[in-house]
């Protein structure tokens, strides 16, 4: 199975939503559409499903154009955020409903429902109604209703957003296990980066009507294409600040606003001459030992997370910076702490926001 999007454009009235979006999905690949609200990711999913029409562009499944077909003939199945289960029907009836509408023979419907229920481990729930199910169970029924159609492509519209934190984590694990048992590709829309990083083979980051980056979760995090991706992916967010270039040879050496010099691993060749910004992940800014550090920061907040502590501080020039310390840190708000900076893992960004990275990033 291959899905190809070619030059998709969409506007609602005078408001553009998607601008020349092109993408190729591979066989059995799990893709996450990640981005803020209003970035166009859900609209694109609905265009693939046939619930919205594109103003321009093409959608091809296995080389066959499907954007001219009605939703039921596209070979895709969509799982909605709000489950969309019929309350007066049992689980079995909900899962069989689409097959009956498609006039699938009755003697085929039962085995299809039973097999999907077995895969999802909800076979013991088939005679219950939605009101008798937990949120996670309802989500599995909604997925099961899609599975019985045996689609080439699953479309998941924020499938975990209605669940509480504990159930969301458990269902995320179940979804990861499910994709190993299902022979179809999947596209999931989410604004939750943890879901995208955990489940996806590749992440498509959206903003401002366009795709900002398409890459594996590791590459999205460690080699962001631009400042938007760098800030949007990662929690706490990356510290990004203007710097001055102080060395024109080899790897770039830059100076922060408080005078701290950072030797990066980014090759100087190819970098713009000025208007450079540095990007530092919190794990690459550490509290120094025995009072040693490249710079000092005044602590404004300490988040103790058990295995580590996140330190939010401010340098002498006023730059807000985020770093890490051990989980049992005794640092308090108002302390002046030394910080070490792992320059080899620092990122640099040009005037247009484009990212530049060293081999260690």
Model-inferred region functions:
Residues 30, 37, 71-228:
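ABC ATPase nucleotide-binding domains
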Residues 42-45, 141:
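ABC ATPase nucleotide-binding domain helices that frame the ATP-binding cleft
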Residues 31-33, 45:
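Short hydrophobic beta-strand immediately N-terminal to the Walker A/P-loop
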Residues 57-65:
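Conserved ABC transporter NBD signature motif
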């Amino acid at each position: 199975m291959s899905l190809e999007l070619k030059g998709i454009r969409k506007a609602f009235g005078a408001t553009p939503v998607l601008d020349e979006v092109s993408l190729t999905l591979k066989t059995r690949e799990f893709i996450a559409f990640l981005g803020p609200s209003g970035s166009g990711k859900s609209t694109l999913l609905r265009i693939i499903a046939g619930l919205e029409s594109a103003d321009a562009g093409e959608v091809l499944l296995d080389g066959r154009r499907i954007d001219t077909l009605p939703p039921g003939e596209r070979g895709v199945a969509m799982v909605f955020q709000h489950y969309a289960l019929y309350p007066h029907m049992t689980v079995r009836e909900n899962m069989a409903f689409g097959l009956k509408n498609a006039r699938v023979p009755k003697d085929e419907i039962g085995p299809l429902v039973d097999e999907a229920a077995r895969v999802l481990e909800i076979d013991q729930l088939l005679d219950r109604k939605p009101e008798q199910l937990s949120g996670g169970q309802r989500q599995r029924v909604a997925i099961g209703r899609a599975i019985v159609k045996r689609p080439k492509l699953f479309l998941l519209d924020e499938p975990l957003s209605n669940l509480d934190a504990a159930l969301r984590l458990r269902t995320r694990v179940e979804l990861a296990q499910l994709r190993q048992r299902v022979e179809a590709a999947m596209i999931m829309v989410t604004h939750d980066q943890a879901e995208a990083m955990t489940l996806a083979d590749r992440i498509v980051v959206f903003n401002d009507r366009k795709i900002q980056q398409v890459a594996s979760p590791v590459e999205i995090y460690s080699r962001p294409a631009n400042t938007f991706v760098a800030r949007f992916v990662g929690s706490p967010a990356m510290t990004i600040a203007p710097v001055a270039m102080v060395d024109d040879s080899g790897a770039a050496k830059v100076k922060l606003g408080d005078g701290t010099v950072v030797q990066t691993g980014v090759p100087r060749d190819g970098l713009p001459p000025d208007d450079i910004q540095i990007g530092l992940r919190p794990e690459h800014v550490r509290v120094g030992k025995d009072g040693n550090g490249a710079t000092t920061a005044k602590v404004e907040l300490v988040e103790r997370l058990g295995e580590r502590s996140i330190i939010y501080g401010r340098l002498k020039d006023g730059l807000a910076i985020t770093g890490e310390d051990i989980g049992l840190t005794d640092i308090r708000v108002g302390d002046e702490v030394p910080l070490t900076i792992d320059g080899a893992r620092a990122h640099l960004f040009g005037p247009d926001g484009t990212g530049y990275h060293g081999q260690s990033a």
